[in-house]
From Swiss-Prot:
Keyword annotations: Cytolysis, Dermonecrotic toxin, Disulfide bond, Hemolysis, Lipid degradation, Lipid metabolism, Lyase, Magnesium, Metal-binding, Secreted, Toxin
Protein's UniProt name: Dermonecrotic toxin LarSicTox-alphaI-1
Tissue-specific expression: Expressed by the venom gland.
The keyword Magnesium is assigned to this record: yes
């Protein structure tokens, strides 16, 4: 049994709880399924400084399968929070010594915020209105550069067009 096509992202809101990752890994190993870690990704969702996130991953022994989330509730996302942290995460993902594999931004419900997130280079968007994202992806500025993820995509590989 290879675990099928199911993937899981352990999304942890507090850096101090990095031991959840090591405990999860140890439990799979002790149950005789260490290979299932190939299906597990990691995310610290507490909006901490990217450098501090990296330190927590090092403590947990994480060397890959890192999704970095950034975001806030949709009602204040763009005009209070901005995309500075997401841009830092994208820069880390794109650097030769970065630890991030994917960057996703949430919660994006407006056309303008969707465009801003895509322009920042995020890999994914969480939304309450998928039609908004689909419509933006069909615009000439985005249709050659981005696409909707498919069943066959590897969630740990950065999509390059």
């Amino acid at each position: 049994n290879n675990g099928g096509r199911a993937y899981i992202v352990l999304s942890i809101p507090n850096l101090a709880h990095y031991q959840l990752i090591t405990g999860f890994k140890e439990t799979l190993k002790n149950k005789g399924h260490p290979e299932l870690m190939d299906k597990v990704g990691h995310d610290f969702s507490g909006n901490d400084n990217i450098d501090q996130v990296e330190k927590a991953y090092k403590k947990a022994g994480v060397t890959g399968h890192v999704w970095q989330s950034d975001g806030i509730t949709n009602c204040i996302a763009s005009f209070i929070r901005g995309l500075d942290r997401a841009k830092k995460a994208v820069a880390n993902r794109d650097s030769s010594n970065g630890f991030i594999n994917k960057v996703y931004y949430w919660t994006v419900d407006k056309y303008a915020t969707t465009r801003e997130a895509l322009d920042a280079g995020v890999d994914g968007i969480m939304t309450n209105y998928p039609d908004v994202v689909a419509n933006v992806l069909s615009e000439s500025a985005y249709k050659a550069k981005f696409r909707i993820a498919t069943y066959d995509d590897n969630p740990w590989e950065t999509f390059k067009n």
